[in-house]
Design a protein with these regions (language model features):
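N-terminal secretory signal peptides that target proteins for export/translocation
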Residues: 1-35
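Bacterial N-terminal signal peptides
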Residues: 40-50
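N-terminal signal peptide c-region/cleavage motif recognized by signal peptidases
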Residues: 52-54
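Periplasmic polypeptide-binding modules associated with outer-membrane biogenesis and secretion
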Residues: 57-70, 81-316, 325, 339-357, ...
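C-terminal structured "cap/appendage" subdomains that terminate the fold
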Residues: 561, 567-587, 598
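C-terminal outer-membrane beta-barrel translocator/porin domains of Gram-negative envelope proteins
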Residues: 273, 307, 412, 416-419, ...
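Flexible, surface-exposed loop regions and adjacent strand-edge segments
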Residues: 150, 238, 358, 383-388, ...
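Gram-negative/organellar outer-membrane beta-barrel architecture
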Residues: 155-166, 260-448, 513-517, 523-526, ...
């Protein structure tokens, strides 16, 4: 048995970076690889010198260390990385073993352990070598103080930005110190400072002073904000097929406004929301000697004139589906998009044609459209034809839509013959997004509202006013938990029954995005086995989510709702359940199992959980 022992007696070897017996300096971004790099260089030379020697049998390595550093050592220790090679000579093997204690010290230091005890044992049995590396990392260094200082005008011009930068620095007193966390904290704080006004901000100096005796880290970072940047002229590259005026019309930036990365992101989003551009890249000049009216460079890659898209999918409510669309982007030679689209699933068949104008001033888009939908659910069939015009605008936080639509619907049911209704409806729709992350929100809210009316005799069978609203609130609980609340209200206000109102403008409840535990659109006015749409709707959800890691979580929820023609005769349908949550690359995917407390049934649900 050959043993190699390195402990506190050899602390001077693993603290060669120390400036005094008690303290070691680790300037920002300085790699802690001095001894490790030298060892690796020697190893390469040693391997090159002995490549002509006879091959030796492979050896096995067992690393006995706490979980917090075991993976780090298995991944980066040379003796572990070369274990499967069969061309390691005896001298090379001895060098690997000898270098292991210093490599362990270098690696554990990056994880905040500066006084490890390392023991390396080699045993040979039946011609096979077994290497055991035992590591006691000792106490992990923790952050004792954090000193962030700022140079430049940020302190007087924008104290809120300085405060936001301090908040973005993620290492706090009492937190474990690691090299990766130290780098992440500096990077996050710098990006926050650069996000508004101070595009040219930089880290003037940074230092992590480590006291290996007390296992305390004193952190200091000095930021230089540099001057305030303002937005200049937007120039566009890559325009070949479509007018450059499209970029001008959707551009939300004004020359001279203070630089804000969210405004730059909004410009990119506005361009990508148009049908013309496959990709958009934006670069803003960051020359601190010319901060005023800094140029904004936009590079676009255009879609061809003809586009065909298609896809297949599955949803619990509607079953498997297939969908597709064809778009010609240069109708009349004037960049007017003409689109034909359709979707088929088990309960609904849908088709639409739409002709739009290019975005006009301030990004408003005008279009004319016609659609036809055939829906067969809950023993009720609705045939709905629509034609109309609309004017829409999509903003960073708020979307607007104004439309004038003509509806003609036919309703087939079990208890009576078909009924036909029509209406000419001026409508308004408004959506506001105020969340921290548009794809995976943890805080904030989403609100959508609609309003419309129709007057009898004006291509309308029955006078009515229609309103609908839906809201979703996200409330974070600690770092891993989350409450989600959802509410939905709808009403068609008219005298008498709703037989003259187009059925597609009425309401039913039930399903994955409504009241779980009940079938899709199975809550409504039940007549002879048919569930008819109703005048009033109310649903609500309270959901609690716990996330085990960044991507996976679990949920428990309570849903309740009703759909009725007479509010005084309403019946509420509650449901409870549990589910799994996955933050997939395409968006949040929810898998739920719900129990309907009124119908005593269990139903599974699979949904792509994007709100709206």
């Amino acid at each position: 048995v050959r043993s190699y022992l390195a402990g506190h007696a050899n602390q001077q070897a693993h603290t060669t970076h120390e400036t005094s017996p008690r303290a070691a300096r680790h300037p920002g971004r300085r790699a802690r690889r001095g001894a490790g790099a030298a060892a690796r260089a020697a190893l390469v030379g040693c391997l090159a010198a002995f490549v002509v020697l006879p091959a030796y049998a492979k050896y096995d390595v067992d690393i006995d260390a706490p979980r917090s550093i075991r993976k780090l050592l298995k991944t980066h220790l040379d003796i572990a990385r070369f274990a499967k090679r069969d061309d390691i000579s005896d001298d090379q093997f001895d060098f690997l073993v000898t270098a292991t204690p210093q490599q362990v010290r270098d690696l554990t230091a990056t994880a905040g352990y500066f006084s490890p005890v390392v023991r390396t044992d080699v045993r040979t049995r039946d011609g096979k070598r077994d290497v055991r590396v035992a590591v006691d990392p000792g106490p992990q260094t923790v952050v004792s103080t954090v000193d962030l200082t700022f140079k430049g005008p940020v302190g007087t011009e924008d104290p809120k930005q300085e405060a936001a930068t301090r908040f973005a620095f993620s290492l706090k007193p009492g937190d474990p110190f690691t090299q990766s966390d130290w780098d992440v904290a500096k990077g996050a704080a710098l990006r926050q400072l650069q996000a508004r006004r101070y595009l040219g901000a930089k880290i003037a100096s940074s230092e992590a002073r480590i006291d290996s005796r007390t296992q305390r880290a004193t952190l200091a970072v000095t930021f230089d904000s540099g001057p305030t940047f303002t937005i200049g002229k937007v120039d566009v590259d890559g325009v070949r097929r479509y007018p450059e005026k499209i970029v001008t019309n959707v551009n939300p930036l004004s020359e001279g406004e203070i630089y804000d990365v969210q405004r730059i992101t909004e410009l990119q989003r506005q361009l990508q929301n148009t049908p013309y551009y496959a990709s958009v890249a934006i670069d803003v000049g960051d020359d601190t000697s010319k901060p005023e009216r800094t140029p904004v460079h936009v590079k676009v890659s255009e879609f061809p004139y003809n586009n065909i898209r298609g896809g297949v999918g599955y949803a619990t409510d509607t079953g498997p589906h297939v969908q597709g669309s064809y778009t010609y982007l240069d109708t009349f030679g004037a960049a007017w998009p003409f689109t034909v689209s359709g979707r088929l699933d088990q309960i609904q068949q849908y088709g639409q044609v739409q002709l739009s104008m290019p975005p006009g001033a301030k990004g408003w888009t005008n279009s004319v459209l016609a659609s036809y939908t055939n829906t067969n659910v809950s023993d009720t069939r609705i045939y709905s034809a629509r034609v109309g015009v609309q004017r829409t605008r999509t903003g960073q936080f708020i979307d607007y839509a104004y439309s004038l639509m003509f509806y003609q619907d036919r309703l087939d049911q079990n208890g009576a013959g078909p009924t036909t209704s029509r209406a000419l409806v001026p409508q308004w729709a408004w959506t506001r997004r105020n969340v921290d992350d548009p794809l995976f929100p943890r805080s904030g809210n989403l609100i959508h509202a609609e309003a419309g009316f129709a007057i009898k005799g004006v291509l309308t069978d029955q006078t009515f006013i229609r309103g609908y609203a839906r809201g979703q609130q996200y409330v974070p609980i600690g770092k891993r938990d989350l409450f989600v609340f959802r509410a939905e209200l709808g009403g068609v206000f008219t005298s008498g029954s709703s037989t003259g109102v187009p059925a597609s403008l009425l309401f039913r409840a039930g399903g994955s995005n409504s009241v779980r535990g009940y079938g899709y659109q199975s809550i409504g006015n039940s007549v002879a086995g048919s569930v008819l749409p109703t005048k009033y709707l109310m649903t609500g959800t309270a959901e609690y989510q716990h996330w085990f890691n960044r991507d996976w979580g679990a949920a428990t929820f309570f849903d309740i709702g009703t759909a009725t023609d007479a509010w005084g005769e309403r019946v509420f349908y509650p449901g409870v359940g549990i589910g799994a949550r996955w933050r997939s690359p395409v968006g949040p995917i929810n898998v739920d199992v719900a129990y309907g407390l009124r119908n005593h049934s269990v139903r599974p649900y699979l949904t792509l959980g994007i709100a709206f």
